[in-house]
Amino acid sequence: MPTIQQLIRNKRQAAENKTKSPALQRSPQRRGVCTRVYTTTPKKPNSALRKVARVRLTSGFEVTAYIPGIGHNLQEHSVVLVRGGRVKDLPGVRYHIVRGTLDVVGVKDRRKGRSKYGVKRPK
């Protein structure tokens, strides 16, 4: 417990909030180029082949980003938009790729939750 004299000399330091997505550098999204597109397995107790991509961002960072939805058209050198948001069962994956922008197409035949997967309203 500091004395009043110590508090006059040095005021209390406010704890700084640490960002969960540092590679975005306080931007809502960042553009990047896929350097590798692959699948990986989630940690226990889940089992699947999750689609992820290694992306080199315009901020200079190279991050691993999750590709949401069923099916995708991504390959090496695809230009993508990356947003924050981790995948709980994939360690080290702290970003999501935005579907329906730049080189990524929206999810085919998606009817519900379309806005999250870049799908236009069906006729």
UniProtKB/Swiss-Prot annotation:
GO molecular function terms attached to this record: rRNA binding; structural constituent of ribosome
Pfam family name, one: Ribosom_S12_S23
Recorded family membership: Belongs to the universal ribosomal protein uS12 family.
Organismal lineage: Eukaryota, Viridiplantae, Streptophyta, Zygnematophyceae, Zygnematophycidae
InterPro entries: NA-bd_OB-fold, Ribosomal_uS12, Ribosomal_uS12_bac
A GO CC term attached to the entry: small ribosomal subunit
Record region (Disordered): 9-31
Function according to Swiss-Prot or TrEMBL: With S4 and S5 plays an important role in translational accuracy. Located at the interface of the 30S and 50S subunits.
Organism superkingdom: Eukaryota
Assembly information from the UniProt record: Part of the 30S ribosomal subunit.
Subcellular location per the Swiss-Prot or TrEMBL entry: Plastid, Chloroplast
Official protein name in the record: Small ribosomal subunit protein uS12c
One GO biological process term: translation
Keywords for the protein's UniProt record, in alphabetical order: Chloroplast, Plastid, Ribonucleoprotein, Ribosomal protein, RNA-binding, rRNA-binding
